Amino acid sequence: MSLLTLAIDVGGSSIKSIILRDDGTAASERSQIPTAHPATPDIIVSQLLDLINTQGDYDRIAIGFPSVVENGVTRGAINLHPDWDGFTLAEVLQNKLGKPIRIANDADVQGCGAIAGQGVELVVTLGTGFGSSLFLDGKLLPNLELGQHIFRDRDTYEDCLGQAALDRIGVEVWNIQLAEVIASLYKLFNFDKIYLGGGNSRLVNVDLSSNLSNKIAIVSNDLGLIGGLALWRSSGS
């Protein structure tokens, strides 16, 4: 029997949702609401419950969340609020909704929807922050979270390519820095493919060497929802 999955993508600027069939087709309209600020756990949980209650029938929930996630517990969501560190999000929502829930890092979820499952594949999400996920022959290496690592001098990847950087330096310089980051990541991971997603991927216009230009793909931000199905497929459920 086909199960319906309510897929939710929590971001620093918006929260998106859709109900999906097992084959990835939509069983509902896509919904989107602005992320409240301050984005404390109580406020975001309230937003999630309000959003979920507007959806139709579903059997289970998959959530992409902008932090490291360990067994349903969030670890350091710096683009939301410090109180998310150690918050038992899966348990809280499951107790309130009575539905099975799986939660993973949002870039990991988007990657699950983007990859081909061949070789070394790196996924980068460009939005409020800088998300990342890494796959080897289709197998996820979870919670990579490159965004908070130093790229150059004292600046992290997120310092160079997050929304605040884009607002400060403009799209032209932002693209120059993105090209430098991609070249650096290639030296680090020797990836076969890099997928660029997130809300700001629409602004990507980079000039790269010929050996890198054919390794880049721009992917739909909706893969942050569609990839949620993989959280259930991974267990054969």
Predicted regions span which residues?
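Glycine-rich phosphate-binding loop plus the immediately following alpha-helix
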Residues: L89-A107, L140-Q177
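Short beta-strand scaffold segments in enzyme catalytic cores
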Residues: I15-I19, S67, C112, F130-L136, ...
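Glycine-rich beta-strand-to-loop/alpha-helix junction loops that act as flexible
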Residues: I61-S67, L126-T128, K193-S201
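A short, acidic, amphipathic alpha-helical segment used as a generic capping/interface helix at domain edges
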Residues: W174-L188
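Glycine-rich phosphate-binding loop and adjoining helix at the ATP-binding site
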Residues: E29, P34-N53, D57-I61, S67-V120, ...
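Glycine-rich phosphate-binding loops at beta-strand->alpha-helix junctions
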Residues: S14, L185-S220
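Short glycine-aspartate micro-motif
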Residues: L3-D9, R60-A62, E121-T125, Y195
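Short glycine-rich, Thr/Ser-proximal phosphate-binding strand/loop in the N-terminal lobe
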Residues: S2-I43, L136-D167
